[in-house]
Amino acid sequence: MRKRKRRVMIAPYVPQIALYRQWLKDTRGLSFESYDAMWRWSVTDLDAYWKSIWDYFLIPSPKPPGSVLGRRDMPNAAWFPGAQVNYAKQVFRHVEAASKAGLPAVVSRNEKGAHRELSWRELKRQSASLALHLKAQGVKPGDRVAAYLPNIIEAMISFFATASIGGVWSLCAPDMGTAAVLDRFRQIEPKVLIACDGVSYAGKDYDRTQVVQELRAALPSVRHVILHDNLGGTGGVADAVRFADTTARDDAGTAAFEPEWMPFDHPLWIVYSSGTTGLPKPIVHGHGGILLMSLALNVIHNDVGCSYAPNSYGERYHWYSSTGWVMWNCQTNGLLNGTTCCIYDGNPGGVRDKPDWGTLWRFGAETGVTFFGAGAAFFANCMKADVELATCGDLSRIRALGTTGSPLSEETQRWGTQQFARLANSSGNPAQKDIWWCNMSGGTDFAGAFVGGNRELPQIPGEIQCRLLGCAVEAFDEQGRSVVNEVGELVCTEPLPSMPLYFWRDEDKRRYLSSYFDTYPANFDGSGRGPAWRHGDWLKITPNGGCIIYGRSDATINRHGLRMGTSELYSAVEALPEVVDSMVVDLEYLGRESYMPLFVVLREGINLDEALKAKINGAIRSALSPRFVPNGVFQVAEIPRTLSGKKQELPIKKLLLGQPIEKVINKDAMANPDCLGWYVSFAHARLGSGRKAS
């Protein structure tokens, strides 16, 4: 690979939040004595704050917005009524300036070492070519385009092409089995399926042509299939068009192509809930809301600058993600601000028979990454594997580390800080002496973050620095009272532009309301307040404004930063003839090593042996993903259930985390309280005598 001259960003680099604050002073006459004062302004004057984001980022529109909030009430808030935007327009506005600076749009690599760079002009041309192909196939605004692709350049091109013509994008990762993908795509009835022939992961190739054929056969709405030869053509799919042919057009039509203007609330993409209480919920986000939320988050709070701007020249943004996680969407959002995105497709921990947690760091070194993000579990694994960053190449350009997906432990943060402090002695990058951790927490539900980073605030290991601008986040106690320095339910009391437009085929918003607003509906405390969005996380807001996330308050599996609903796992396990009932709990909590036990009730006369354990794990691996194989499988007599028959996942999770049984479960509300003794003993054995669950 040709060595490129490195330009390390050195002082006086101005934090992006400082640039925005100065702009507010210059254009709005606003001054703030502290970040807390700025945050309070942003959540009390929503119109002024979100209009400032529109203006600051120069959102292209043929029709500037007349008002910000036509309606303020959740979940029916109407943002920027009458305005027109297009997500892809915001990306492509950087083509000429970034190209003139000689900067690529995307740098990619897979675990086999294949390195590619895509220019901004090629990104637009190939997106235009595919967009025109989709239009020729009859794709109109509102039609769904479903993709079954890994984290590669072709996925980005497919997304921009779809968004450009008003199609609605939806993506599943190729490590998901047929059943899990159909649970999602059947609900949205896509017109086009864009898929790959296979993927490589952890040193092994996986042919996916059979899965693609099964998807096509089970999706009668699909009229057209496009197949990308990701493995070089390991197999064919009848009547599928080659992806390369759809992006090959280079003529007057592609040169003149421009994304079409769409209403602010036109659907951009459909992402999915974890499916804890049934089928995954198809969550619809709009062009405008995602534009505003993503720019504010990525630039102001993540401090990711424009690659061709003097203050952040050469910025390269990386956030490791599979296409089964909303962080793929957030990674792609880096292009909105003219930032070069660096993407990696493969296992960050190396091949199965030779684990190597330095893999992703070497990728970052060789591609010149400046912002390096991943799930918190990745950094914990690096620490446990004794990775020495000094042996991973030239990491001198990295000036920020991003984490999400699960809480980052103090121990892991201190490990990373010490590693970079040692690097700073030779890197010449002063930012590495006390590397900035941009820890954040949010959700697929609104494709953003509630709490996150601020380059100007102090860092306290184990804490997230602040509540984000525009996010009216509070911690509620059991009575719905806002509390500080106590653990409570994370709620948002004011609307955000990127909150779901609706769930697909949920015309009366019943599922939407029950998902977020059942706990704190309008006037929930008799004072006229509400409704408030309940997110499902435990949160403590510290007296200095910091935030600590204590994990999920519901039963969602959050496995190494990837979410999956328990119901999907049960479908796979309980389809086996030997299994009568099952329950799984995810104990990834406060940065501890992920531990997920699976409890199974077997048919009479059957005992759990190694062969049956392997069969159960194989069913999960095949139907869902290898990432959701449990740490252990345990035979039990009964699964705890409520009187109405619901599995009591959350109480058992709390029990296994060390809380007393009498505080986590009401035996009178149980159908089978006598079964709890076994789980208490299991918790006692796991926690040890020092933390007895009685």
Spans of features found by a protein language model:
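Conserved AMP-binding/adenylation subdomain of ANL enzymes
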Residues: 289-316, 323-370, 385-386
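Conserved AMP-binding/adenylate-forming
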Residues: 133-176, 180-182, 300, 318-322, 399-401, 408-546, 553-556, ...
